[in-house]
């Protein structure tokens, strides 16, 4: 009992004692490519054999020239963080690619621990059309920030219709520049992207700093938050005491009279901490109870490293089943 009480208090205190997220973050831009950026540019599939070797695999990020340019920006702006950008496109399309965000963090992020080399956290990535949802998940795992720049918009005619070019594609107009080497300010309190001196508001970035995402950033990654919530809930339920959560409340989206998709039905049936009778719809952000863990197209040694980092000997003693598919990275399995 004392152990459970101590665990519940320790989880709450260890989180609340963490430093708050910096109100202002200075960044210097680096355009990685124009158009959508596939995660294969960040971590090529033909280099999958080296993904568990962080130092070696980091050498395949984009190109050797790009790596040199990023290093030059870091030397020119030692007090700023490099923000990797997909100009006129979306960052991270195609897959979640944990090794991709690992590489971005290695070159542009912060060292997680001075005792563990080549493992970095807190990268900052951006795209004119934002971050691919599946890639945003892995950005959150590293405590990173994903920015929807909206720096190009469709040019409209007098009737409000997009003006097309000779290829029948919409003509775009630039609302502000993120040319490589541009210094910008991210205000995490007002949730705005500003000019270097903070005088001009460029775009609202509230979607990048929801209460849940702010927790991930503050904790240096989503794993610590998820595990903390699980342990605190378990301790309180076992002791029969009220949960005094230090974490952001769940986001519950409920639309009266609206039916449920198949996925929403499964989600509702397994939601944790939701009042009886509450029906949740898309956009909700709550914990769920799972009994099957699946991982598609997985690099086996990376999974082993993740489990080691969690001090885990098994995937979970509570799930009914777990699987991994090797897919095109099967060659790295022993």
Q: Where are these predicted regions, by residue range?
A:
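Long, structured ligand/cofactor-binding scaffold of large enzymes
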Residues: 38-43, 47-59, 64-65, 69-82, ...
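Conserved phosphate/anionic-ligand binding catalytic regions in large, soluble enzymes, centered on
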Residues: 35-42, 91-103, 212-231
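N-terminal basic/disordered segments at the start of proteins
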Residues: 256-280
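Feature captures the catalytic cores and cofactor-binding loops of soluble hydro-lyases/lyases
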Residues: 7, 41-194, 201-208
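Single conserved hydrophobic/aromatic residue that forms the stacking wall/gate
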Residues: 1-6, 11
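Small-residue-rich anion-binding loops in enzyme active sites
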Residues: 12-52
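Internal alpha/beta core interface subdomains
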Residues: 7, 194-199, 206-263
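Structural signal for hydrophobic packing residues in well-ordered secondary-structure cores
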Residues: 38, 46, 50, 65, ...
